[in-house]
Amino acid sequence: MISEENREIQKLLSLIGLARKAGKLTVGTEAVCDSIRGGKVKLVIASAEASDNTKKRISTCAEYYGVCAEYVAVSPDMLGKAIGKTATACVSIDDENFVKLITSNL
């Protein structure tokens, strides 16, 4: 039987995958930081298992530019699989409607 927490994580990963298909997602630490600096990012989602250096870079950049960064209990492999890629530590959402959907599930 699937726990409630696992259902919520699966729903979150599905929404991230949908954002990817809609072209509203940026993938990877460097690309996410560049998008934050460009003012496009509405929300950053990162794996809680990301390296300390990656977490620091994301947090510093997001905090400086006033972007919300959420760390979720998924592995980089799971996050990557949700978007059809290899392991990735973080993604950013560029669309306000997807942000509303995703934050209601965090």
Predicted regions and their residues:
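Small/polar loops that bind or transfer phosphate-bearing groups
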Residues: 46-47, 71, 90, 94
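N-terminal first-folded block
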Residues: 5-46
